[in-house]
Structures are given as C-alpha cells and as structure tokens.
Amino acid sequence: MFRAQATTPYDTAIAKATDENLTSEDWGAIMEVCDRVAGDDNGAKEAVQALIRRLAHRNANVQLYTLEVANALSQNCGKPMHRELASRAFTEALLKLANERNTHNQVKAKILEGTKEWSDMFKDDADLGIMYDAYYRLKQTNPQLQPPSAPQKNSLTDVDRQKEEEELQIALKLSLQEEERKKQQTPAGPSGAAGPSSSSAPDQAGTPSGQGADAGAGAAAVPLQPTGTGTTAATVSRVRALYDFVPSEDGELEFKKGDVIAVLESVYKDWWRGSLKGKTGIFPLNYVEKLADPTPDELQREAQMEAEVFSEIKNVEKLLTLLSTSSKDEDSEEIAKLYQQTSAIRPKLIKLIEKYSQKKDDFTQLNEKFIKARRDYEALLETSMSHPPQPSYHQYAVRPQGYGGSPTPYPTQGPPQQDPQRFYPPGPHPDQYPPSSPSPHLQRPGGTPGPGAQAPFYVAGAEVPSHGGPHPNQNFPPRDPGQRIPSAGKQPARLQTQQASSSPPPSAPYAAYSQPPAQQGSYGNPQELSTSAYDSPVASHPHPNPLGSNAPFAPATYPAEERYGTPSAAPAPLNPGGGQQQPYQYNSYQNQTPPQPANTQPPQGGMYSGQGYNDSSDAVGNVPPQPTSAAPPPPVPGSQRVHSPVYGGPPGAADSRFSLPSRMGPGAPSAPLGGPSSPGEQPQYKAYVPPGSSGPSAPSAPSVPADYYRQPGGTANY
C-alpha cells in the first residue's frame, strides 16, 4: 500500500554535508559532492532529488546547509545543474518551505537570497526563466523578507546637527547624574544597598514606597528610564546588522546579518560611519538596529552566566576522559549524566564564543592600528635623522665689525695682487728671526742723553720708545745673509748655522719689505742696520761652517759678553739725573770711513721690524725716521761677512749685530776673544782693534781719534 521513498547514490554524501550537528559548513564534504556530480551524467538530476528530500527536514540548520550545497553545485557543475535547479520540482519545494508558518526567518531569508542570485545567474538563458518567476512570487508573498533599498545620501541639515548636539548634551547630563547617584549611595552602607540592586526602572516607578523617598533620590532614579533612546551617532555607540549589505560605492562598509558595528560619527542624514573587523566605512541606518549599552544588571547577569559555564569545564574534561578510556559497547550512567550536564551549557557557550570572538577581532584591529602607527612613526624618525636640516649659510654672510674696522670674514674674491712686496716668497722659516728685546743691561752709545730727550723704559721684554724731540734720520735696509770683510782686509772665520748645509732658495725672501734699486747677487745688497748707511757685498754661494754642526749658537739678541762676559770699561750713565746703572760693554769702531746715506727704501714692517735688526734703533731709544739719501758703494767690493748664528733660535736664525765691524777682529780669528777653547763651550767675542793698536779700547776712551762714533761727522746720526 505504501511505497518506500526512492534513494539515490548521493543521499549519503549530501546528508554528510548537511548534518544537523555541524556548527559551520563542511566545505570538504560539499566539494566532494560537487566532484561526484560533475563526473556523472545523471549526477545533477539525482543530486537535486536528494536536495529536495533534505529541504523537508524539520531542523533549520539542515535546511540552511542544504541551500548552501545547492549554491555550490550551481557554481561548480555547469549547465546540467542549472537546468535541474530551474526545474518545476525544485522551485516548488523552495516556495513551499518559504510559505510555511513554522519555517525559521533565517531560512526564508536564505531562500529569497538564493532565488535572487540564481535569477541573476540564469537571466541570459530563456529556458531557465522559471527561477525568476519563483523569485518574483516569493517577493510578493513575503515582502518583509526583502532587504530595504539604501537611502539617498542627503547632507545633514542644521536642524539635524542641532538635534544631535542636544542629544549629546542630554547624554552627558544623564551620565553626570548617574555618577552623583553612585557617590551618594557609597557612604550609605548596607541600609542603602537596595537602590542599585533593585530590578528595573518601571518596577521602581510603580512601587508605592517611592513616596517616602527624598527628592534627590527620585531625581537620580529618573535617568535610568531613557537609556538607549538616542537616535543620533552622538548617543548610539553600537548597532546590529539586520540584513546583508554589499557596498555599491567606494567608502561603504560591507557587513553580514548579525554583525555588531561600532558607530563613529554621522556623515549623512541616514548614513553613519562605523568600524567592523578592522575596516571603516559608511552604512545605511535602515539595515541596522540600535543596541543600547548594557546596564549594570545585565553585566552582572552576564558575568554570572560566564562563571557557570566555566564551572562546567571539569565535567567536560571528565566526560572526554571517560569516552576515551571506556569501550564503545559499554553503557555508563555516569557518561549519560555528564553528557546531559554539558549539553545544557551549549547555548551559553555559543554566546560566550561569539562575545570573545568579537573581542578578539576588536583587539586584533587595535593591534594592527598600533603597529601601523608605530611603523609610520619609525619611518618619519628615520627620514628626519637620515636627512638632517642643512645650515643656512646666508645668515653668516654679514657680521658686525667687532674690532675696529676689521674686514668681514667673507670678503668678495677678486683678482690676485700683482705687487710682489705684499707676499712672502719662499725662503727661511719665519721663526728664524724671532722677536727680541734689548738686554736690561744695555746702555746707549753716545753717553748722556740731551736735555730734551727722555730715558726709555722697558715693559715685559719689549722696549717702548720715549717720545721726545725729533730723531735723526737713519737707514735700515734689509740684511743679507752673506759675509763682509772688515776694513783690516782679512776675512773672518765663518760660523755655521743650522741651515748652512743648504743654500737659500733663489727667490728673494726680503723682497716683501723693500724695493731697492738695481741689486747684485741673490739678496740685493742689503744695508747694515747698525751703521748710518753701509752697503754690504753679497756672497754668491753658501759657506760651510768651520766649527762643525755641533757648534753652539750665539744668543738671539744679546752678544756673548752681555750674558757671560765681564765689562771692560765703566758704562756711561743712562740718564743725566743719575740712577741705578746697569753694566754693559760694547766694542768701538775704529778706522772706519763714514759712509754716505743710501737711497734705499727701509722695510715697511714685517718679520724684521721687531727682530735682530732693531738693535741700532734700540740704541737710540726711539723709532728712527726714514732716510732719503743714496748709499755709497761698499768700501771693499767682493768681500764677505760672517753670518752669525742665533743661540737657541730656530734653524737659520742669525743675529745681525755680530756681523758688524765692531764685533770682528782684524785677523778674523776662528774663535773670538774670550771664546771657548772647545766647540762645546759658549763663544766669546772680542772688540775690533785696528791695525797697529795694542788692544781693544772702550767707547769712552778719548785717546782714539779714529773712532767713528767719536768723530764730529760720525755722531750726526745720533
């Protein structure tokens, strides 16, 4: 009488893919079904028949999984499956399930979504139009299943913004009142603890005992009622999606039904901006419902439920242990009891899974934002450190003249100077002639100064000349490192300096200080500084040092007798007024013909202005004026003079005073009078003695008529 329902080879595979105990789609089983149907000519027809039988199941999960399998078959099995899905049998089964009163709303929404998608897929084939007819009929009979159309993006008006601001102020006021109410209940103790633990606001409003409450407590209880009544983004923090939303423009947020979206701000009149799973965009308000913030009672109940679920963890672990150790055929009452207890917490466990899954997504999103912000900061920091700001040099172009009209630090570059007198040609090191000052025991030749003259004074090793009457003219030409022959006609012994082994460069090192007339030799016939105007012949080649390289040098400024010798005559008084006299001995000049003044320009300053050549000027005590007359030719042409070294000075340094005629004897001995007997001792020099004289004479001796400085013509320069 009754025929058994026919079965197909695909019933088992589809039943496995749509098991009611599944918590999510089993895509492995679904793809296995698709592979079998694609490889079988009758697979599409038999698979659709198995799907129709699974749609008749009373479990909503089975119905949802069956619709998902049908969607997978339509996308993977081609044209034969499209014809079977658009058949009259399958479409009638869908409409029947959607129109039943006991069908779950999610199943109805899934059927509507599937028929719409298949209608769009089959619209190019006229033979498959039955699917579009089924979709149209389902939409007419169940208008509530169709998601609403997205509203227009209208800009917010001033009224809307004012309303949002008012709701924000109300929410802030309610929050402050709630905080005040909590502060008032805190010191009340156990007697006032019934207020926060009471059930709900409507129950409190209907309680007659509220008449005895004070006005402050009644006012504090009022804010509990309007909670969650906000309608703007300023007062709503979360919304739940009612439908699936697929973005149609850039900047819109995609979400599925049931997703909870965090509200950020209002963008348009019916569009808000929200954040979901790390993405931000706008969404329509008619696709979501507002969620009120949980009340303290709700939070307490949620915490209690969570504690109950975690308390069952021991039973779950015990059940798993018994199931893994006991045999399959053995029935145990303990296992059945534990299974019932653990099954009771399944709905609560699902809610907790959803809750913590959402929290996990929120924390993951926050972590991604933090990592991105940190990377941006590190990138900016590296960029700023790898490209430091360049200094602006223009701000140093002009500096104030801090020291009396000194030139600016960055003068304009011009053509090089062509005047050779302004440059130092290559020659001896500048330190060859260090500055020197006269000895404190030095006395000026000429005896007592005149009534109009002032005695010189000495400051820190340098002499400051006195300013008295006019000074006589003297000529101070640049010196020459060559030798000269004294009037006796005998060449003195040559002394070696530290640069005796190498000749000076051919360029004139003294050309920067004078412009003499036609000169002979390498250094231009310099004039002797300690005489009035005396030309010196120039040696055309360097002379070796007869004393050896280890011979000691004379002092830089003072002769040997000034440091080590004993004065041979009483010195003349330094000033007419009398005072402390300092001994000093100098050698007289005899049998010297006074030379004529030379027409040679004196040095204009430089490295010789304060060095060995200033001894003659120091003898006067004042800076001598510049001579204008021409110098006579040298008395003995071709003669050479000794280049006296400077003791303790740099290489090549020489003292000009030791090359004067007064410092050399007539026979030019290799070692001066009183000098050392060995090269290691300090040399001493004797005074000049003319031929026929028995010994040196003091400058003040009146018995020397041939003394140059005692002659009437010879004292004119002093």
UniProtKB/Swiss-Prot annotation:
Main localization category: membrane
Annotated PROSITE patterns: SH3 (PS50002), UIM (PS50330), VHS (PS50179)
Annotated segments matching region Disordered: 142-164, 178-230, 384-718
The organism's place on the tree of life at top rank: Eukaryota
Gene3D superfamilies on file: 1.20.5.1940, 1.25.40.90, SH3 Domains
Limits of the SH3 domain: 234-293
UniProt entry keywords in alphabetical sequence: Endosome, Membrane, Protein transport, SH3 domain, Transport
Limits of the VHS domain: 17-146
A GO term for molecular function: ubiquitin binding
Gene Ontology biological process: protein transport to vacuole involved in ubiquitin-dependent protein catabolic process via the multivesicular body sorting pathway
Assembly and binders: Component of the ESCRT-0 complex composed of HSE1 and VPS27.
Protein name as annotated: Class E vacuolar protein-sorting machinery protein HSE1
Organism from which the protein derives: Pyricularia oryzae (strain 70-15 / ATCC MYA-4617 / FGSC 8958) (Rice blast fungus)
Lineage start: Eukaryota, Fungi, Dikarya, Ascomycota, Pezizomycotina
Name of the gene: HSE1
